Each structure stands twice: as structure tokens, then as C-alpha cells.
UniProtKB/Swiss-Prot annotation:
Function: Located on the platform of the 30S subunit, it bridges several disparate RNA helices of the 16S rRNA. Forms part of the Shine-Dalgarno cleft in the 70S ribosome.
Source organism per UniProt: Cellvibrio japonicus (strain Ueda107) (Pseudomonas fluorescens subsp. cellulosa)
Protein name: Small ribosomal subunit protein uS11
Family (UniProt): Belongs to the universal ribosomal protein uS11 family.
Molecular-function GO terms, alphabetical: rRNA binding; structural constituent of ribosome
UniProt xrefs under InterPro entries: Ribosomal_uS11, Ribosomal_uS11_bac-type, Ribosomal_uS11_CS, Ribosomal_uS11_sf
Amino acid sequence: MAKPGNKTATKKKVKKTVIDGVAHIHASFNNTIVTITDRQGNALAWATSGGSGFRGSRKSTPFAAQVAAERAGEAAKEYGLKNLDVEVKGPGPGRESAVRALNNVGYKITNITDVTPIPHNGCRPPKKRRV
């Protein structure tokens, strides 16, 4: 017969609630990455155009960025987010559609900032493509 031992009770993991967050939208020419973080920068949810089912040249469309932003927004809803600051980085085609999609999900967008890195004549850029 088994001895009745001391069983350690497993604690239920409690989801933290965050009211204000930051949506980082990285829109490159090939893909769009949407990450939603809290104010300290801890990631709550993220989604990409490629991970949303788009492949090849369809990954770099505004619609793919919209779907990625909707998926990240819905995943971050379970943390109780209400307000978002949006930081947009990069020259890609999904910049504006991702911001609109986050607005349509139901977040109150308080601030939109462009944080695209601009070199002060730093590294030499890659050579131009000859097609």
C-alpha cells in the first residue's frame, strides 16, 4: 500500500493585467512583425505576416500586415489591454494598415511614433539591384 506523502499543491498561474501597452510594428519590404509589449518592454503577444499564413510576395502586402496586427491584438486582449502607444519602424507597405487594424480590434491608440532608424552617414548601403 502506498504511503500518504506530502503532496505539494500546484499553484495556478495568474495572468497579469496590463492596461497600457506599446505596439511595435516592424514593417520591412518583405514582412511585417507586430509585437505588443507592456510599458517595460516585456512581450505580451506577437504575430507576423509569414506566420499568419502568407508566403512569398503575399507576405509583403498591406492585407497580410492587417491580419498579423489583428492576430497580435486579439492575443493581447487576454491581458486586459485598453490603451496602446504605437511605434512604427521601417518603410514597408504594411505600416498604416497594421495601425488601422489595431484600432479596429478595439484598442484606444494614444500615440503613434515613427522610430525608423536613420543613419547619420553611417554604414555604406548595399549596391543597387540591376534587374
